[in-house]
Amino acid sequence: MSEKSDSNDDKSRTRSVVYVYSPEYIQTCDSLSKVPNRASMVHSLIEAYGLLKYMRVVKPHVASIEEMAVFHTDSYLQHLHKISQDGDNDDPQSADFGLGYDCPVVEGIFDYAAAVGGATLTAAQNLLDGKCDVAINWAGGWHHAKKDEASGSCYVNDAVLGILKLREKYDRVLYVDVDLHHGDGVEDAFSFTSKVMTVSLHKFSPGFFPGTGDVTDTGLGKGRWYAVNVPFEDGVRDDRYCQTFTSVMQEVKALFNPEAVVMQLGADTMAGDPMCSFNMTPVGVAKCLTYILGWELPTLLLGGGGYNLANTARCWTYLTGTVLGQTLSSEIPDHEFFTEYGPDYSLEISPSCRPDRNESQHLERVISTIKGNLKNVV
């Protein structure tokens, strides 16, 4: 699986990269019922490909209530802490905080939220301290959580915490979200400010969660024009996605001129994901990532969605190789989860034959609208 941008190889090989990891952190993240053992699968494949030796592995700290309260309300955090200890699914207040249905209450869920929040804060702090050019937390990227409620399997919005940490040093921070779902929690958090621009490329369709993120959603008040949304229909493939991404990001860079970047790389866009929506491969996402890395700004990389666990591990391992300028063998190395990659035991993900519902003329209109909106950025 060797398709990489040659022009970026020299830069990527000299890039300083921090990888946030500890056995305890991975074990905690493995407990999330939506993606059981996914954190272990991702880390094990990265390790099996020998990529750890090219990065500085940093143990994450666990976020305190005070650190999470920089964004989340005390009442939400205190309630999450209380029910986490009890494992109480019947607390009548839980529904007010978005807990239940898609964010089930399980024992230890507060510890999970604190672990993820702390890991992203650890990554951001390493960027602030100049200890790396890129920091990675693949178990982070939970972009739906609101300040006072859980949402969409997200109990803490670690992406928002990471952005706020970077804002301690960098005046303008750009958030880029290529998850299948609209990054609504992050957009909402910064919808009234011109200091953080949010760019989300996602599926936008009636009845599809979270139901927000049309091209006309552009922010509010002082933050108007600082939210950029790129809606896609089902079936989009690498080429069309990357062309759209590049057209939008070129304009964003020129007009917003960010000083740091947070990029959420949810892998539920992959062909073969149970969401059965987009038709992408790691090669396409890597092209988007390479474009951002070419700006040579402090960059925080986060995970997100991805419900075909093997494909998610394939994707994030390939992206880790991209960051490091390492070409990875197509053959999955022998390791603890080797049997999960059958029947072909290959790193590649092939697109399916499903149709692309995105018409070129429609996407051109979307891009034109976005470029017109961005002209209002001052």
From Swiss-Prot:
Which Cys residues form disulphide pairs? none
What's the catalysed reaction? N(6)-acetyl-L-lysyl-[histone] + H2O = L-lysyl-[histone] + acetate; N(6)-acetyl-L-lysyl-[protein] + H2O = L-lysyl-[protein] + acetate; N(6)-(2E)-butenoyl-L-lysyl-[protein] + H2O = (2E)-2-butenoate + L-lysyl-[protein]
Primary location group? nucleus
Co-factor(s): a divalent metal cation
- What does the record say about activity regulation? Its activity is inhibited by trichostatin A (TSA) and butyrate, 2 well known histone deacetylase inhibitors.
Active site, renumbered: H144
Q: Which CDD domains match?
A: HDAC8
Residues noted as binding a divalent metal cation in the record, renumbered to the chain = D179, H181, D268
Xref: PANTHER family: HISTONE DEACETYLASE 8, HISTONE DEACETYLASE HDAC1-RELATED
- Can you name this protein? Histone deacetylase 8
User: What taxonomic lineage is listed for the species of origin?
Assistant: Eukaryota, Metazoa, Chordata, Craniata, Vertebrata
Q: Its encoding gene is what?
A: hdac8
